[in-house]
């Protein structure tokens, strides 16, 4: 009996973790002129209020987490500098 209760509790814990996953929102812009690329962040710790640093066509920006996948979080190990990006 105890093993069944444990299994149910474990399953509920796993389900809670999966359902509480947060993502970067889908970017509004799908393209960007190279002269307008600006990084406001390079990692999540650059953002306030537990926002995510999300990669977009015009640079990296902080966004509130979304329940729906569609955006892409910035790789914290990638080479990045905040400010305007010049090619």
Swiss-Prot record:
InterPro entries: Elafin-like_sf (IPR036645)
Family indicated by similarity: Belongs to the venom protein 11 family. 01 (wap-1) subfamily.
GO cellular component annotations of the record: extracellular region
Intrachain S-S bonds: 24-54, 32-58, 41-53, 42-80, 47-62
Residue ranges occupied by any WAP domain in the UniProt entry: 21-66
Gene Ontology process terms (BP): defense response to bacterium
Keyword Signal: yes
Name of the protein this chain belongs to: U14-lycotoxin-Ls1a
Record key words, sorted: Antibiotic, Antimicrobial, Disulfide bond, Secreted, Signal, Toxin
Tissue expression summary: Expressed by the venom gland.
One MF term in the entry's GO annotations: toxin activity
Stored SUPFAM superfamilies: Elafin-like (SSF57256)
Compartment(s) of residence: Secreted
Signal peptide: 1-20
UniProt function note: Has antibacterial activity.
Post-translational modification: Contains 5 disulfide bonds.
Top-level lineage group: Eukaryota
Chief location bin: secreted
């Amino acid at each position: 009996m105890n093993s069944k209760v444990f299994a149910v509790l474990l399953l509920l814990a796993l389900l809670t973790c999966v359902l509480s996953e947060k993502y970067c929102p889908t970017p509004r812009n799908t393209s960007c002129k190279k002269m307008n690329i600006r990084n406001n962040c390079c990692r999540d710790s650059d953002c306030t209020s537990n926002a995510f640093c999300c990669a977009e066509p015009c640079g990296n920006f902080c966004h509130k987490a979304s329940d729906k996948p569609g955006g892409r979080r910035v790789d914290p190990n990638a080479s990045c500098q905040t400010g305007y990006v010049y090619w």
